[in-house]
């Protein structure tokens, strides 16, 4: 299995220099290496746009509901090696136009929320914005994966405004609760841990934990709903 790219629990890192190995690899497979570097910069800008939008929504909802629906925001730019491997799996040559056209998850933003209802509230608010276009939606909260994974996945197109042009870039967004994120993080560590075989028994135990996590989220949503009712009654 191919190890997933890592999300960083912080604002997007500054641009790093390519290693000599990366330069040789991509200069051999991708003649327009400087153009590739520019494309990655565009994706970084798209990540910043989406991250800013969620920060603004978080600020607005904190004023409206007296709490922050977003616990944290993580960002990820797919590594050069991951891009090359994914293009190979698709049977496609390493060309800029094909990379941009066929890989929808080069730029990634993960939003961790307190409650399941927050996930859908943030989704609705984001998709109402004029410069956001929904391309693809997969609701693994309503329909979890077989292994128990839960999260809401969106692929959106966002406009970025440069000095002399406007571009539309694709960004993958994952929205999930703290419980969903904890489970996914632990599952990933166990599944890809070096020198340890991932057994069927471990998979079954993780599936059981995923069900407990879903029950926890449901109870937290119920408590949140009751708190809203109680607050309304006091007014």
How should each PLM-predicted stretch be described?
Residues 2-47, 51-60, 169-235:
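An acidic, glycine-/histidine-flanked metal-binding catalytic module
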Residues 24, 30, 50-52, 83-89, ...:
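Short linear motifs at secondary-structure transitions and domain/linker junctions
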Residues 100, 113-220:
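Long beta-strand-rich cores associated with HINT superfamily self-processing modules
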């Amino acid at each position: 299995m191919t190890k997933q790219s890592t999300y960083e629990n912080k604002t997007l890192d500054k641009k790093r220099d390519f290693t000599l190995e990366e330069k040789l690899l991509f200069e051999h497979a991708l003649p327009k290496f400087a153009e590739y570097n520019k494309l990655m910069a565009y994706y970084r800008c798209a990540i910043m746009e989406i991250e800013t939008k969620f920060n603004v929504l978080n600020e607005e909802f904190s004023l409206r509901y007296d709490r922050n629906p977003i616990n944290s925001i993580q960002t990820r730019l797919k590594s050069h090696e991951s891009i090359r491997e994914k293009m190979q799996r698709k049977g496609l040559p390493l060309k800029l136009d094909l990379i941009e056209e066929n890989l929808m998850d080069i730029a990634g933003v993960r939003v961790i929320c307190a409650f399941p209802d927050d996930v859908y509230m943030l989704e609705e608010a984001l998709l109402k914005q004029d410069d956001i276009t929904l391309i693809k939606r997969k609701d693994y909260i309503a329909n979890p994966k077989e292994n128990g994974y839960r999260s809401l996945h969106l692929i959106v197109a966002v406009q970025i405004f440069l000095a002399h042009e406007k571009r539309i870039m694709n960004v993958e967004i994952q929205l999930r609760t703290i419980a969903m994120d904890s489970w996914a993080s632990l599952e990933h560590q166990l599944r890809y841990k070096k020198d340890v075989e991932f057994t069927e028994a471990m998979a079954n135990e993780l599936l059981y934990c995923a069900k407990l996590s879903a029950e926890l989220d449901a109870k937290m949503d119920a408590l949140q709903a009751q708190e809203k009712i109680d607050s309304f009654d006091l007014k």
